[in-house]
Regions:
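Anionic N-terminal interaction surfaces
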Residues: 1-30, 47, 100-123
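Generic hydrophobic, helix-prone segments enriched in Leu/Val/Ile
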Residues: 9, 15-16, 37, 89, ...
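Phosphoinositide-binding peripheral membrane targeting modules
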Residues: 17-71, 75
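Charged/polar, solvent-exposed surface patches and flexible loops
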Residues: 56, 91-95, 114, 118
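Alpha-helix boundary/capping detector
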Residues: 61-62, 80, 115, 119
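Short, surface-exposed secondary-structure junctions/capping segments
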Residues: 62-70, 95-111
Length: 123
């Protein structure tokens, strides 16, 4: 039986985890201790990320609209999630982590431009 790290849940919403090749649909529990994801098919297939182990959390922003996909950077690696309520999740994360750890991710054009610039940079 999966035990939640959270004592108080601030937000419960549906979403998708892209940890494997196929996305897993499930529920997010955002609370006082951790960001948690529980798959719908198998509750024992879960991801618990304590707030203390998160280095950064970010999403793409276009104008004033936050995309549904967001990434969580931790000690263990990078986790990719999607939720219709990603803006609410990021607001709660900003309260728990601070403004410096919630970032705006670069767009595809910015990544390509950086790669091209590095190709022609003097070494």
């Amino acid at each position: 039986m999966a035990q939640s790290l959270n004592k108080v849940v601030d937000l419960q919403t549906t979403g998708t985890s892209y940890l494997s090749i196929q996305g897993k649909v499930g529920k997010f529990l955002v609370g006082d201790q951790a960001l948690e994801f529980y798959a719908d098919r198998n509750v024992e297939d879960y991801i618990q990320i304590p707030w203390s182990s998160i280095h950064q959390i970010g999403a793409n922003v276009s104008g004033r609209k936050v995309s549904r996909h967001f990434e969580v950077f931790t000690d263990q690696g990078k986790f990719l999630f999607a939720s219709k309520d990603s803006g609410k999740i990021l607001k709660i994360a900003r309260k728990k982590l601070g403004n410096d750890k919630v970032v705006k991710l670069p767009t595809l054009l910015q990544i390509i431009g950086r790669k091209i610039k590095n190709l022609f940079a003097k070494k």
